[in-house]
């Protein structure tokens, strides 16, 4: 048996490979820390705001972070942090309305990966070894390499489809293409699928189309039913393809507070207020190193549409990342979720990651 998770149709039973068992063990330890210091708080109808000192966060450190933003990252629109289930830091800049959704760009990929996890839990997808060729056979163009029909859900999730992709040039080609799915599935194969990581927004869109097909609903309707409404997320606009399908790789709009909810779902091992949205084993595998990643995520590793890293202090962490500096950054050991959001489209010379600000917030947290 390969060291990948195998979800069985019609059953909650999950078979684990070595990496998944290790991930669950590590997550159990950090979850125990969180449970030891706070009861579960569920922000479905709104976040609780608390004094940072009540949750072991140094307010002087947070004030120092807030003061750096206007001069150092003037494009930043919002910076928020949740610890122990309550907001302990929340700042908006440049006139940003807290209730106005922001285009989270490639953070959309982490939403799509989550929807794949829900579909697996519901038995709508047979398992991670199921292929796009089995689910959407009629979407393959006649020029597609036969290898592409055999690309599995695991490979789409981990960006190891082996399809050639240039992060900027092919994104522009995708936007101009009359059929995003056909354009992606018709790309050249440059390696054996499953062997090499290549960042591919088109692949995330294909993943979303397979989830929609399996659910029998448009992806946005499925997302609203199984993810957005249960978490109390009110999305804004969602970019659409020429086929009138929402873009599963980029272009969803969310408020910064709703972005926090997605990170909090994973921090709580896929559970939300007594309901298991995704299986704990899927949440663990999604946020565990599966493939090597590349410079797109600062050479972090890659899970299931999440980037895998560690803080400067060495705490395991994972994050969703969007063009321009959109972040949902989760540090389980600290029971911490940080969101950074940028509302306007940036010129290339303005691009500057707020990662060091996130690190400063993490450094302000006193370990439990």
What is each model feature region?
Residues 85, 102-128, 156, 207-211, ...:
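Active-site SXXK
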Residues 203-210, 250-271, 326-342:
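Active-site-proximal alpha-helical segments within enzyme catalytic domains
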Residues 66-96, 328-329, 335-339:
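A short, well-structured edge-of-sheet supersecondary motif
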């Amino acid at each position: 048996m390969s060291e990948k998770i195998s979800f069985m149709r019609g059953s909650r039973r999950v078979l684990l490979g070595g990496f998944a068992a290790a991930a669950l063990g590590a997550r159990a330890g950090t979850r125990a820390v969180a449970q030891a210091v706070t009861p579960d708080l569920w922000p479905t109808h709104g976040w609780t705001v608390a004094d940072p000192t009540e949750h072991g966060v140094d307010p002087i450190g947070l004030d120092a972070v807030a003061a750096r933003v206007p001069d150092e990252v003037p494009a930043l629109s919002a910076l928020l942090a949740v610890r122990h289930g309550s907001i302990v830091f929340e700042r908006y800049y440049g006139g940003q309305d807290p209730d106005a959704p922001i285009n989270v760009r490639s953070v959309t990929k982490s939403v799509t990966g989550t929807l794949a996890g829900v579909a697996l839990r519901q038995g709508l997808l047979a398992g991670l070894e199921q292929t796009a060729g089995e689910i959407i056979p009629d979407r393959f163009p006649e020029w597609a390499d036969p290898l592409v029909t055999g690309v599995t859900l695991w490979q789409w999730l981990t960006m190891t489809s082996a399809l050639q992709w240039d992060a900027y040039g092919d994104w522009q080609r995708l936007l101009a293409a009359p059929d995003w799915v056909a354009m992606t599935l018709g790309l050249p194969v440059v390696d054996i699928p499953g062997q090499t990581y290549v960042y591919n927004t088109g692949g995330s869109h294909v993943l979303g189309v397979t989830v929609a097909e399996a659910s029998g609903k448009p992806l946005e309707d499925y997302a609203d039913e199984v993810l957005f409404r249960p978490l109390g997320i009110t999305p804004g606009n969602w970019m659409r393809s020429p086929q009138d399908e929402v873009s599963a790789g980029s272009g969803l709009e969310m408020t910064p507070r709703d972005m926090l909810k997605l990170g909090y779902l994973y921090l709580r091992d896929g559970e939300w207020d007594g309901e298991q949205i995704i299986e704990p084993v899927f949440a663990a595998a999604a946020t565990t190193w599966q493939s090597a990643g590349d410079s797109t995520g600062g050479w972090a590793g890659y899970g299931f549409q999440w980037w895998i890293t560690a803080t400067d202090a060495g705490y395991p962490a994972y994050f969703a990342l969007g063009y321009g500096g959109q972040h949902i950054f989760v540090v389980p050991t600290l029971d911490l979720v940080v969101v950074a959001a940028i509302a306007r489209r940036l010129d290339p010379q303005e691009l500057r990651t707020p990662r060091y600000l996130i690190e400063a917030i993490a450094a302000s947290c006193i370990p439990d």
